[in-house]
Amino acid sequence: MPTVYGLHEIELQPGVEPEEYERFFAEEIAPSPMVPGWKVHLLKGERGARVGKFLVLLEIESVEARDRYFPNPGEESEEVTRFFEQHPEAAAALEKWNKMGPFGSKTDISTDYVAVAE
């Protein structure tokens, strides 16, 4: 099963400083529980068109693991709802995260890529 890489360009909300965003991610998102088969990474542009801008990289073990929680774009499964009910600290961190730089929303520029060769 090929790995899925979800790339999400992040634009910080007005008043959110990059250092604040990085600190929040490191202290609240990175240690939070994730749905099984998922890893989340915060990247910052160092060269190129998005220098200084953030990108969230979701590393998902397979298309099936993605679709288990998000069967269609913008649609959450009952299973992901239960996961966040069982992990309220992760739900609270995600809610705060979305206020800082919308992620997984209509304002999010994103694409899921499936590994075709490694």
Give the ranges of each region predicted by the language model:
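Active-site-flanking beta-strand signature of metal-NTP-handling nucleotidyl enzymes
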Residues: 3-11
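Short hydrophobic/aromatic beta-strand micro-patches
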Residues: 11, 57-59
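An amphipathic, aromatic/His-enriched active-site/gating alpha helix that lines ligand/cofactor pockets
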Residues: 27-41, 49-50, 59-111, 115-118
